[in-house]
Design a protein with these regions (language model features):
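RNA-contacting regions in translation and RNA-metabolism proteins
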Residues: 1-157
Length: 157
């Protein structure tokens, strides 16, 4: 829908502000572009932001998807959009890395696959990428959305 880059950023900010306002949450919205990716962030009080973040970031993912679809509707060139809320994505990544490390250690120690709790595609990808550096485990996903799980399995030599 939006034309040039600045217009697109403004339109995304407007969409995000409307979602927050409709949810009854007072926030500041910051939208910028970094290395070809549109970076958007909700800034505000943690308690209020919880409504926009949702369980394990599910609401944040949905808002991100909605804003991206609306901003680039009918356009040939689409840029990735990453929506954060007061550093939530970084905190969640740290927590997922810890879970991944524990699962990898258990898989190697016990010699059998470890199933992680169901998670969204972005989080599964983050764990896949994180554990790629290890040569003693492999990862794969199984199941159907929304119950799709990541499996951490020991590499058999």
């Amino acid at each position: 829908m939006a034309g040039d880059d600045e217009e697109t950023l403004d339109y995304i900010a407007e969409i995000l502000e409307i979602v927050a306002e409709t949810s009854g949450v007072e926030v500041e919205v910051v939208v910028d572009e970094e290395d070809g990716t549109i970076m958007a962030e909700y800034l505000g009080k943690g308690d209020e932001l919880a409504v926009l973040i949702g369980h394990h970031g599910q609401s944040l993912d949905a808002i991100q998807h909605l804003a991206h679809r609306m901003a680039f509707r009918g356009m040939d060139e689409r840029k990735p959009l990453s929506l954060n809320a007061a550093g939530y994505r970084e905190r969640r990544a740290t927590a997922l890395h810890a879970v991944a490390d524990q699962a990898a250690e258990a898989a190697v120690r016990d010699g059998r696959p470890v199933l992680l709790d169901p998670m969204g595609a972005q989080e599964r990808k983050l764990v896949h990428e994180y554990l790629k550096t290890r040569f003693d485990v492999e990862t794969y996903s199984e199941g159907q959305e929304p119950s799709r799980r990541l499996v951490v399995a020991p590499v058999v030599s």
